[in-house]
Design a protein with these regions (language model features):
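Sec-dependent signal peptide recognition
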Residues: 1-9
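Aromatic- and Gly/Pro-enriched helix-to-coil junctions and flexible linker segments
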Residues: 13-141
Length: 141
């Protein structure tokens, strides 16, 4: 008897147990990271409003994205994560210093020196399926 069906079933179960990325968490916690200016670096939006992967350009005079733009950003950026596995997610590896587990890719430089950086931790929380707690109006569950 072949063990192939068991291997396929195990792989499917592992995929189905991965947490789904949460839109509300993305909108309230992840998107502000894309807008934040960091010393020595441009904001993510500066390159990614016309780069790959893209962020929606801000509307004239807007400080953040509207609902439609946020949903488009979510649809694009969730493709650059591996739910449940931050270190296999390009969104987290590319801007992370190589000595901290990042890779050499990211023309925009290394925004995070370590995995303990609070913003890197926020991105990791999203990849790990963290959700906002509606009872605390934006707290996490």
């Amino acid at each position: 008897m072949s063990s192939l069906p068991l291997i396929v079933l195990t792989a499917l179960l592992a995929q189905s147990s991965a947490p789904a990325p949460d839109y509300a968490f993305f909108k309230e916690r992840v998107q502000p990271i894309f807008l934040k200016k960091r010393p020595g670096h441009a904001r993510c939006l500066t390159c990614h409003d016309h780069g790959s992967p893209p962020l929606q350009p801000l509307s004239p005079g807007a400080a953040t994205w509207d609902e439609e733009q946020s949903r488009k950003n979510f649809a694009v950026w969730k493709q650059f994560i591996k739910p449940g596995d931050p270190l296999k997610s390009p969104l987290l590896r590319h801007p992370l210093a190589e000595e901290a587990g990042g890779d050499r890719f990211h023309a925009g430089g290394k925004h995070f020196k370590s995995q303990s950086d609070p913003e890197w931790q926020t991105l990791a929380a999203w990849v790990n399926g963290e959700k906002l707690d509606p009872k605390t109006n934006g707290g996490t569950q």
